[in-house]
Amino acid sequence: MYRWLTKVLGTILRLCERPAPGARALLKRRRSSSSLFSTAVDTDEIPAKRPRLDCFIHQVKNSLYNAASLFGFPFQLTTKPMVSSACNGTRNVAPSGEVFSNSPSCELTTSGSCSSMLKLGNKSPNGISDYPKIRVTVARDQPRRVLPSFGFTLKSEGYNRRPSGRRHSKSNPESSLPWKPQEQGVTEMISEEGGKGARRPHCTVEEGVQKDEREKYLKLLERLKEGAHGSTFPPAVSHHSSQRTQMDTLKTKGWMEEQNHGVRTTHLVPKQYRVVETRGPLCSVRSEKRYSKGKADTEKVVGLRFEKDGTRGHQLEPDLSEEVSARLRLGSGSNGLLRRKISVLEAKEKNFPSKEKDRRTEDLFELTEDMEKEISNALGHGPPDEILSSAFKLRITRGDIQTLKNYHWLNDEVINFYMNLLVERSKKQGYPALHALSTFFYPKLKSGGYQAVKRWTKGVNLFDQELVLVPIHRKVHWSLVVMDLRKKCLKYLDSMGQKGHRICEILLQYLQDESKTKRNTDLNLLEWTHYSMKPHEIPQQLNGSDCGMFTCKYADYISRDKPITFTQHQMPLFRKKMVWEILHQQLL
């Protein structure tokens, strides 16, 4: 001990006796603690301290460490190590307040997206220090994301926003929920046509997507409804003069996807309800097949129940509610309940007349290879402004067609074009006289009153028609109103089970004004009724992206005076059929 003290004092005296140098190197300026992990590069290159003083400091520290080790005292280094950042390559100096213990490794956590590693070996840059190795890992967490709403969400996001600059659904009110950080990346091979060579890894993001998507979408609609009643909730849609797009809402920024030559790189981030850009949630074709395969048999049978309900009124309402609940719980282990219900329904199906079975076979349509190839080309890569079909004073671009991809939201152009195809078909014998109003009709009527849409029916007498279809768009959701002039009633059909009494009242008042203008007579409003279809009376969507498809298929079945018997699992086929129908301007 005394020898050690003598050695230290001797070193100090020798240094004090030496003359001070004429010019000393400038010291590096200290950085504040706030800039410890700054990505900015310090451009001031200042020479380091002179080696002699640096040598002395390290000798003192080394001596103190040896003394502490001799007496068994814990020793802490209060040095200012140089930290090399892995994300930007700059050197950052830790503040003097940072304390690093002599444990084998230490971990510091800060906010950000990169990691910094600090390794102090037995030798310092000057070759003197031999204190233990210290490893400091600075892991920066993923930043919390706030997304735009379908987010889905999907996705996210947000969901690759709508091509060709149509009316967009911008943000999801649920986007304020934080993301859970997850550091995992998966490169996945996907076949556009459902090839066999690829296997999907087990992804946390996709667990329960189909299970929760409908509930999340319903919450979004409730939030939007509250905003419509006078709250300060910001509008989720920006309007364009030509069309409206909805994909932004369910896609997530964290769900980045590339579909080049069948390869998709997905950064797995837990899919919370943030309507994200929600590039929101786009699932692959294989995911869709896996989802639909598990539900196909059940939904076919449920379709029978929907169909049977049309002939028996409200008798089956309790059973149907249970069946819909069972479908929504499909991913949560209710297989036993479903098997029991399926067996009961299959037994009842045997009693259906052959006419009912023939009606169901209408939906079992298979596309030929040539049709599949043509559809794939239309949905494939190409200029988004390329016009693929033109009719009814409407032009359908490749960007519009691509809204018919699975889990994408339909825009105005596609829906208006399809409604015109239904009107053209109704001119054939055996179909009811039909007229379809534009998707922009109701927003214009609601904002400007009858005078704003007075000329929209120029040359058309609505009262000569049997059915009038009115597609309704409310921020991020599509629904349909059917005016049945034969029965003097208005029906509101919503794939999310919402009610539309106020919408029907506005349209009924429009009919009153139209009758005064075109026929100079008043309607007897006491003879007219309006009704919102209940969830057990019409098929309901099980995700957050098919509301536009359900609206089109409601119109298709009603325009043929057919019971609505389709189900959710048929949507992928219906999307492909609609692509072909728009390209060839005729319905299959």
UniProtKB/Swiss-Prot annotation:
The keyword Membrane applies. Ubiquitous. Highly expressed in brain, lung and testis. InterPro entries: Papain-like_cys_pep_sf (IPR038765), Peptidase_C48_C (IPR003653). The keyword DNA-binding does not apply. It is an enzyme of class 3 (hydrolase). Residues 157-184 are annotated as: Disordered. Residues 72-381 are annotated as: Axin-binding. Residues 394-558 are annotated as: Protease. A motif (Nuclear export signal) lies at residues 316-331. One of its GO terms (biological process) is regulation of G1/S transition of mitotic cell cycle. It is found in: Nucleus, Nuclear pore complex; Nucleus membrane; Cytoplasm. PROSITE patterns: ULP_PROTEASE (PS50600). This is Sentrin-specific protease 2.
